[in-house]
Amino acid sequence: MLSQLVLDDNSIACLYVCVIRFFVVEDHILHATQGLVTRAFTDELWNMALSKIIAVLRTHSSYCDDPDLVLELKNLIVIFADTLQGYSFPVNRLFDLLFEVRDQYNETLLKKWALVFREIFELDNYSPIPVETEEEYKLVISRFPFHDAEIEKQDFPKKLPMSQSVPQIYTQVKEFIYASLKFSESLHRSSTEIDDMLRKSTNLLLTRTLSTCLQNLIKKPHIGLTELVQIIINTTHLEQACRYLEEFITNITNVSPETVHTTRLYGLSTFKDARHAAEGEIYTKLNQKIDEFIQLADYEWGMAESDGRASGYLMDLINFLRSTFQVFTHLPGKVAQTACMSACKHLSTSLMQMLLDTELKQISMGAIQQFNLDVIQCECEYKNCLCLPPWLGSNLLLPDFF
């Protein structure tokens, strides 16, 4: 009959009370009477009841998607097991069940925090955090471990390089660790086991939940070049903060990270992967934008003479590149350089394809001169390091795309 029940937490608690009462009475009869019941009979009855109870609990927990309810279920199991263990009934199978419930609890936490992360990313403005006063500055750094000597020297108001999602994400990771820790309470586990449990669940949060949210964010159509640049900056700061998360767990469990077999946090790879994905998306979006400008090109291939200056579409494209790469001044030099190289190579290839188009049957000298003016303009801007941040230097060796 137990296996046919559909239970909520209240009915489970009532079930536990009934079972405990029954077996406490059986235990009392066993020890207070002669020959009325035997230990073998009591053990057989207990094993049968335990199998039914475990089946019901396993089914109940598998359908529970609220971490608070799973936590209540765990607490009931612990009380039930501890009580009957006090009467010498074997409860190892119940503690084994707790490992399954723990996995279910972690899954519900991960789903909950996936929604939290998505909301944070949706509400972020992807702009540096403005701080007007010292109090505001202290409030931010109390939530996120940020230290920059140059920024600290600046007068107020000033801006911090990361956007508002960074301290929010960091705070929520810590909240997840606290929530994960709740399951370990009253389980009679060693500090090392709890430390390992926390680190493994946090790794799942970083490498699966947060990583997926970041990758999905980067691919969203409304995320432009400015937002991608900010995401790269954000992930850099989150990556640097991973060691503080390590310390946070260590302070909770008092288990040294140098202990043999201590699980390390994999946040570094999560944020590096997201950063590389954002960089790749920057290169892709730049090329797509170049294609849009190229589609505006309307050469009169039969024109008698050139206009004497670069084409309007090309100057618009160059102005776009100038303003776009100004946004890249906060990126590592290699990223800005690679983006410039990628954009210029794509532009030169597109111009070459335009000139060698098989549908183009005849070109006048005037059209060739006009096209040549455009190529010269591209070459001039490129060699002046239009697309490169000034700290890379003017002596940088540039491939001859044009």
Segments (PLM) and residue ranges:
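Low-complexity, flexible helical/coil segments
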Residues: P145-D148, Y382-L386
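Extended alpha-helical solenoid scaffold regions that build the rod-like backbones
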Residues: M1-S88, E136-G302, S306, F320-A339, ...
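Alpha-helical repeat/alpha-solenoid scaffolds of the HEAT/ARM/MIF4G superfamily
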Residues: F95, E107-Q154
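Long alpha-helical repeat scaffolds
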Residues: G312-I318
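Short C-terminal domain-edge/linker segments immediately following a structured domain
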Residues: L139-S142, C378-Y382
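Cytosolic small-GTPase signaling regions in large eukaryotic proteins
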Residues: T42, A49, Y63-E119, L123-N125, ...
